[in-house]
């Protein structure tokens, strides 16, 4: 290790640790926002799906090699029943948003496997690792790209939405967009705007999920940066509740209302606002707190029933089906190395060779 960094860490150790531990929140404030509730399981038949995705990549000077996959697993009280799984390996040219494109593509596969499994049979809840709100907030600012495509072809968005409605467990954005407009755009413009089209494809699937199965959807996040409850805290709400409460229960819920970009409302045939009930929960004493988002405005009794339902499958404070889904899809470094060897990319430069 570089000596000056060791010296700096030693000299500033107390200051750094103080920042790591500082909450700037009174414990009483956290407890006042926390509702004690001990979830109780039940004996009736119950089926739940769990969805997670994974990504990994290797960067080269001329492209990024990436791999993504997603799985939706169906569980009942008797255990595992079945799964829907898909994935993709590909190359993307360098661009300022290349990693965001990979994340969007992973999201498409997650949403499509979720929809596919729900439509295959009856289930009570569909758990998804992540946040609906985080994705929807990032849609702001895509109107300019949409207008650009409409200027190229006034019927572009209508053609595009119709094309991506194919029931395939695949990413259709680039193929369908280039079928409509060709590849005559400036490369930088095309690469940057392709992210918008991938976001539209993901949103299109999410709208189907919200419209048809909104009451069953539950997004669960193990991490969050939101400070909606404690706006002056250095730490996010999730960390505050995790550190300052120990009982099972949940935070007083917030209702979040979001609007779709105006340029998309007509094409997606979904003009109303999207409402989500957001809260933090702990399912077992002294286990971790996680963030929950459910579609629509929910009552306290709805939330308690949801926690009762989740407790049926909870192991060490977390829904086991989501833990199993994560284990199924995780793409490790050795997996990427194997793909690299299969593709025989040995002669492609990664840009760090001159440092060796």
Predicted regions located by residue number:
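Acidic, metal-ligating active-site segments
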Residues: 55-94
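Acidic/glycine-enriched edge-of-secondary-structure segments
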Residues: 87-107
């Amino acid at each position: 290790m570089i000596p000056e960094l060791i010296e700096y860490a030693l000299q500033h150790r107390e200051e750094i640790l103080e920042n790591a531990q500082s909450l700037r929140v009174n414990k009483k404030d956290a407890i006042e926002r926390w509702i004690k509730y001990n979830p109780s399981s039940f004996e009736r038949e119950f089926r739940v799906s769990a969805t997670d995705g994974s990504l990994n990549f290797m960067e080269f000077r001329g492209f990024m090699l990436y791999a993504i996959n997603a799985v939706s697993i169906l569980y009942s009280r008797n255990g595992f029943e079945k799964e829907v799984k898909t994935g993709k390996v590909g190359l993307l040219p360098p661009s300022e948003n290349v990693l965001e494109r990979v994340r969007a593509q992973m999201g498409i596969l997650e949403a499509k496997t979720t929809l596919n499994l729900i439509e295959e049979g009856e289930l009570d809840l569909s758990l998804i690792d992540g946040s609906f709100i985080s994705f929807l907030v990032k849609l702001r600012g895509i109107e300019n790209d949409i207008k650009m495509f409409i200027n190229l072809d006034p019927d572009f968005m209508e053609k595009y939405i119709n094309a991506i409605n194919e029931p395939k467990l695949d990413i259709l954005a680039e193929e369908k967009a280039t079928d409509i407009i060709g590849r005559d755009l400036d490369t930088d413009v095309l690469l940057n705007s392709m992210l918008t089209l991938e976001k539209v494809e993901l949103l299109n699937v999410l709208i189907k999920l919200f419209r048809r199965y909104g009451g069953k959807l539950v997004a669960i996040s193990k991490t969050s940066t939101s400070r909606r409850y404690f706006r002056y805290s250095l730490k996010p709400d999730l960390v505050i509740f995790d550190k300052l409460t120990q009982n099972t229960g949940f935070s007083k819920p917030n209702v979040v209302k979001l609007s779709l970009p105006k340029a998309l409302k007509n094409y997606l045939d979904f003009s109303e606002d999207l409402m989500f009930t957001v809260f933090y929960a702990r399912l077992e004493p002294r286990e971790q707190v996680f963030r929950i988002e459910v579609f629509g405005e929910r009552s306290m009794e709805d939330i308690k029933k949801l926690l009762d339902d989740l407790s049926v499958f909870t192991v060490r404070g977390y829904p086991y089906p989501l833990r199993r889904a994560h284990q199924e899809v995780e793409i490790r470094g050795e997996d990427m190395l194997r793909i690299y060897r299969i593709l025989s990319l040995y002669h492609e430069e990664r840009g760090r060779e001159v440092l060796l």
